[in-house]
Amino acid sequence: MKINGNEIRPGNVIEHEGGLWAAVKVQHVKPGKGGAFAQVELKNLVDGRKLNERFRSAETVERVRLEQKDYQYLYENDGMLTFMDNETYEQIELSREWVGDRAAFLQDGMKVTVESHEGKALGISLPDQVVLEITETEPTVKGQTATSSYKPALLENGVRVMVPPFITTGERIVVDTNEVTYLRRAD
């Protein structure tokens, strides 16, 4: 679908220079002289490169709609992560390297959303929060709770986060998967 340069919004995916790019930041500029334009920060969906472009209002770009499909995480085998489509029971494999650091937060049976274009996976969305157990953290020192200091903790998936001093080894906490930060104790 073709759209004008001034209609680009953050989150839109456009076809540009032979690739698919996501608009990260968009700033509309109307200078005193000349026509209005949109200053757009783009991120390549395949290799992650960033690019700044100007699109004039009269210029048209091809907006791409990504297919979003829900999958269930099954298991990992030799660096390949296996997901199952809940409707067709079809399985797909994505490399752990392609999923990136967020692969550490995958849990058996977790529902994820895979974004694809023309059958090629471009992105994966995990739930915003997961519950994990702390396997190792320093003990609380009496009197240390007066200040708002944080201490490092190792989670069951091998990821390190900073937690408040009252959190102890063996507790289950809620972690933000986007920022990789402690949110609260799990219920």
From Swiss-Prot:
Biological-process GO terms, alphabetical: peptide biosynthetic process
Pathway it works in: Protein biosynthesis; polypeptide chain elongation
Entry keywords, A to Z: Cytoplasm, Elongation factor, Protein biosynthesis
Localisation: Cytoplasm
Coiled-coil intervals, chain numbering: none
Keyword Protein biosynthesis: yes
GO CC aspect terms: cytoplasm
Gene3D superfamilies per the UniProt record, alphabetical: 2.30.30.30, Nucleic acid-binding proteins (2.40.50.140)
Chief location of this protein within or outside the cell: cytoplasm
Pfam families with a match to the protein in the record: EFP, EFP_N, Elong-fact-P_C
GO MF annotation terms: translation elongation factor activity
Cross-referenced InterPro entries: Elong-fact-P_C (IPR015365), NA-bd_OB-fold (IPR012340), Rib_uL2_dom2 (IPR014722), Transl_elong_fac_P/YeiP (IPR020599), Transl_elong_KOW-like (IPR013185), Transl_elong_P/YeiP_cen (IPR001059), Transl_elong_P/YeiP_CS (IPR013852), Transl_elongation_fac_P (IPR011768)
Top-level taxon in the UniProt lineage: Bacteria
Function: Involved in peptide bond synthesis. Stimulates efficient translation and peptide-bond synthesis on native or reconstituted 70S ribosomes in vitro. Probably functions indirectly by altering the affinity of the ribosome for aminoacyl-tRNA, thus increasing their reactivity as acceptors for peptidyl transferase.
Recorded family membership: Belongs to the elongation factor P family.
Name used for this protein in its record: Elongation factor P
Species the sequence originates in: Parvibaculum lavamentivorans (strain DS-1 / DSM 13023 / NCIMB 13966)
Underlying gene: efp
